[in-house]
C-alpha cells in the first residue's frame, strides 16, 4: 500500500505540527515500527518559510512542536527547497546528503528511521 504524500505546497509548519502526527496516528504499521522508539528530532529548515521544528517520538506516538528542543537526539539540517523535493519524492535523503543539501547531527541511526515517521 502506497503511503499518502503531503500536498506539494504544504508549509513546513503545517507539515510538522499537523500532517506528520496525523499521518502516524492513522497508520498502524508506522506506529508498530516506532513502538520501541523514544526520541526528540529537531529539523532546522533554512530559507523562506523555514524555521525550527521539533518532532517528539514516544512509543508509536508522534507530536510536532514549533521551535528547537534543547539537547535533541538528532538534528536534521536542510533548506526548504530540499525539504520540498524530499517530500515530493524528487530526491532521496542519501542523494541530498551526498550533495551536502542534508546534514544529520546526533544519532545517525535514528536518521535512518526518519522515513518511518515522515513517509
Which residues does each PLM region occupy?
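Feature captures hydrophobic
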Residues: 1-119
Amino acid at each position: 500500500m502506497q503511503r499518502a504524500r503531503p500536498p506539494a505546497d504544504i508549509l513546513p509548519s503545517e507539515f510538522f505540527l499537523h500532517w506528520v502526527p496525523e499521518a502516524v496516528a492513522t497508520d498502524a504499521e508506522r506506529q508498530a515500527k516506532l513502538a520501541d522508539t523514544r526520541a526528540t528530532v529537531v529539523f532546522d529548515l533554512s530559507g523562506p518559510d523555514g524555521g525550527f521544528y521539533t518532532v517528539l517520538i514516544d512509543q508509536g506516538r508522534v507530536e510536532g512542536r514549533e521551535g528547537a528542543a534543547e539537547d535533541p537526539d538528532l538534528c536534521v539540517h536542510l533548506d526548504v527547497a530540499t525539504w520540498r523535493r524530499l517530500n515530493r519524492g524528487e530526491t532521496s535523503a542519501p542523494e541530498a546528503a551526498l550533495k551536502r543539501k542534508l546534514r544529520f547531527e546526533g544519532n545517525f541511526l535514528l536518521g535512518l528511521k526518519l522515513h518511518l515517521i515522515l513517509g
